[in-house]
Amino acid sequence: MTEIIEDVRDKSASKIDLVRKLLAKAESTDSTAERDALNERASQLVAAYGIDEAMLASQDESLDKITDVSVLLERPFAVDFRGLLGNIAQALHLKVVVSKRWNRDQNNGYGGWDVTARLFGYESDIRRVQLLYPHLRNQVLAGLANVDGEAEYGPGQAANKRAYIAGFAGAIYLRLNRAEKDAKAAEKAREDALRDQTLLARVSDDHGAE
């Protein structure tokens, strides 16, 4: 059993390393099509990692405990980025509680809100969110620099940027949710095929013994 766990852990580590590389490349590209393709592949690998961790936890619950962690959402657009973090967390089966605290030291003494999101769920799912969110946030920040619109400054420009963040967050949720469903379906198909093979082997053995 220990050897099996170590083997799965090694494969999971390889998946996570590749996800980091894909997301880093997605941050650096100016091509929307390439970025989307890289994010799509990263989502698939993150989903596969989740399946690996669930399989390990089914053998030993201590390998993936329920816990919580707090994430301070950085400015600018901290309130809007809670939507991105929340969508990632929801797609990866976490519960999120968001709180705000007035910080008078922000904005050169004018004050501002500190926004904190508290994530609840399995450790492996929290790790997946912690892996994805910083990279995807960086992608959004890079995209905001290219947001077009009639408003060049002021409230109108801020509204355009908030709309961009919301659209990006929505697309990420759909991509991750689809990857999760596809990974679970593939794992179920694999388990069904293995069960059928085992049953067929037993039937063959029974016939051979007659």
Question: Where do the protein language model's features map onto the residues?
Answer:
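Short amphipathic alpha-helical coiled-coil/interface segments
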Residues: 19, 35-49, 165-172
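Short amphipathic alpha-helical segments enriched in hydrophobics
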Residues: 30, 46-49, 53
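Extended, helix-rich structural scaffolds rather than catalytic motifs
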Residues: 1-13, 50-210
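Short, charged, low-complexity amphipathic alpha-helix
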Residues: 1-40
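Generic, well-ordered alpha-helical scaffold segments in large soluble proteins
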Residues: 22-25, 41, 45-48, 87, ...
